[in-house]
Amino acid sequence: MVLAAGAAAPDFALSDQYGSETVLSDLLQDGPVALVFVPFAFSRICTSEFAELSAHADLFAERSVQLVGITVDSVWTLRAWAEQEGFSFPILSDFWPHGEVARACGALDERMGAAARATVVVGRDGRVAASFSSGAGEARPLAAYREAVSALPRA
């Protein structure tokens, strides 16, 4: 089960698509963070979800929310995917230990061996402000992001 509102978000360090280390607690110094877990790079639904989020970056900017994608794919796969699709936000590799961050956030589908479609919005205080998920074959609606982001205090 995905971390519920009020739960402490686990701190972590993962590499982004360019190999740079990203630490959640460092990101939180600049404001809330939306962790968007998807199963696999280059898959149809994952690509369409990230494209939609890139196109609606203003939704997150209005509340100073940093958008961060997370998959169990390798850094090299994520770089190729991000460059091909032109995503406007960092994508982190939860490749090894395989799915460790997704598991800690309650967002790992153990049967599939990949992240589930889950979103965890973490407030500056390191606590989950909102979370939601959808089935493996279902994109999360943009309205769910609007609702989650609107639960945050204005910057």
Where in this protein do the model-derived segments appear?
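Chalcogenol-based redox active-site neighborhoods
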Residues: M1-A155
